[in-house]
Amino acid sequence: MELLIKQISAFVEDVFEQKGYDKKYGMVTVSDRPDLCQFQCNGALPAAKEYKKAPIQIANDLLPALKNVEIFEEITIAGPGFININVKDSFLAAYVNEMYGSEKLGLEEPAEPQTIIIDYGGANVAKPLHVGHLRAAIIGESLKRISRFVGHKVIGDVHLGDWGLQMGMVISELRRRSPHLPYFDESYEGEYPAEAPFTIDELEDIYPAASKLAKSDAAAMEEAQQATAELQKGRRGYMALWQHILNVSVADLKKGYGNLNVDFDLWNGESDCQKYIDVMVDYLKKNNYTSFSDGLLIVDVAKETDNHVIPPFIVLKTDGSSLYSTTDLATIWERVQDYDPDQIIYVVDKRQELHFEQVFRCAKKTKIAGEDLTLKFLGFGTMNGKDGKPFKTREGGVMRLQDLIQIIKDAVYNKLQENEAIDPSEVDEISRKVGLAALKYGDLSNQITKDYVFDIDRFASFEGNTGPYILYTIVRIKSILRRIAAEGFQASDKIGVPHSDVERSLLLKLSRFNETVEFSFVNHSPNRICDYIYDLANTFNKFYHDTKIISETEFEKKSSWINLITLTMNVLETCLELLGIEAPEKM
């Protein structure tokens, strides 16, 4: 179904056209003064310049015809020529009823669905997830869900760091600890063990030990570099060992991301694009895109219009080996070959902006990415502690993600234990859901590009613009519906016209659901959904306090209210689903 705001705009545009004005001036927006009106059209002001008339004259020209539009309850002119609009309750109720009867709450499918790849996650194998992985994971997951809900084909790719020097470090450290393993015997020709010679806990101890040693011992660094080179040349034992590292790590990462309610369609990594690098480099050379600078193979990506220096894109190092930039470009090559996407969106730390600017420019200049392919960098800000610095443990180290999740779960658990109405056996699971909502909502309610402060007391609060408050509102509605069901009341399937200002306000808020989702998709802004559901929850709670739903004796009125709060619950839960948040049945 068409957006409510577009339907209203169409009527106003027709009136502009009827009166001899360009219809483009008839665009309607939601009123920024809801105390004065529901919607407004400011088109008379810009039209005044074109038609050499005062805005108030244009607005008055339109007024009689606007008052005759069947869906409008009231039209007034304010200030220099603002057109204030209130719609009829019957029109509003009809729109909301159509939402109520629709599987996707009235959202229109796109005429031409796109294929969109979202690159988020970015975890490294052999390392545990830490707080630095939080934002990419939950922002990317939300964008994936929003895009998919809107109707596009969306592919989420974790893009693991599973290649390069870190692998050589791990292999070298394993060799020092267990030199007897067959993976290190170049004369070994048998089958390698199916089971990895280490657990995830051992693996997570091996990498930091190897990294620390390599930084302080030149010989150890040389060993790691040699192991990396042999792995990348396909040494049989090292490849088998690398596969073990990958398998053990991915199993643990899936568990870690699962605890965040995050999943991926592709578990690809840097290693997956390696087979494309030689072909890609040959293509770049044959088409004269490359040159040499101080032994480096580069592509010049600077433009005359640049107001700051954009360094050349490095394809290969002096020894002919690849870099992160090479694998990122080869990954675009791979994705174009395999999926022919319309968009590739990268959800990464905003401090990587220059790197991706170089990658995107190179991909476009060399035609690896065609004109129709949109490459989008979505750089996110930092999660900081109360001191304004990147969030750390008390000891100053990087906190594991599972520890952060546990901290906020415990904070919620302590609050829920005070509620004697909750079965003690359910408190743990409810705490998990509410804690995760507190964490994810606290993050997603901020603009992606902004830094924010992780404030556990504020995030876990059951009041204000928080995840627990939204969940509590949903649980309140579920409780009402359970009580009504226990009465045996059978409601009709219709939402009637509103009986009060707050009920009308609730219908208006519900009618903005599709507009909000579409805006969030186009602008990559989950925070807009957070703003919307906080506003909707507040409006519902005012309606709840002012309306005696359960004790109402008039059938049609009670039925309408039951359907209205059911739709409110469905909209809230759908929005939470788009944010990757689950709602419990009780709190």
Curated annotation (Swiss-Prot):
Q: One GO CC annotation, please?
A: cytoplasm
Which EC main class describes this enzyme? ligase
Main localisation: cytoplasm
Q: Which UniProt keywords apply?
A: Aminoacyl-tRNA synthetase, ATP-binding, Cytoplasm, Ligase, Nucleotide-binding, Protein biosynthesis
Molecular function (Gene Ontology), one example: arginine-tRNA ligase activity
* Reactions listed under catalytic activity: tRNA(Arg) + L-arginine + ATP = L-arginyl-tRNA(Arg) + AMP + diphosphate
User: What does the UniProt entry say about where the protein is found?
Assistant: Cytoplasm
The keyword Ligase is assigned to this record: yes
Q: What is its EC number?
A: 6.1.1.19
Q: Which GO terms describe its biological process?
A: arginyl-tRNA aminoacylation
What the entry lists under InterPro entries is as follows: Arg-tRNA-ligase, Arg-tRNA-synth_N, Arg-tRNA-synth_N_sf, ArgRS_core, DALR_anticod-bd, Rossmann-like_a/b/a_fold, tRNAsynth_Ia_anticodon-bd
* Motif 'HIGH' region boundaries: 123-133
Protein family membership: Belongs to the class-I aminoacyl-tRNA synthetase family.
**Quaternary form?**
Monomer.
**Per its record, how is this protein called by name?**
Arginine--tRNA ligase
Q: What species was this sequence derived from?
A: Alkaliphilus oremlandii (strain OhILAs) (Clostridium oremlandii (strain OhILAs))
Q: Which gene carries the instructions for this protein?
A: argS
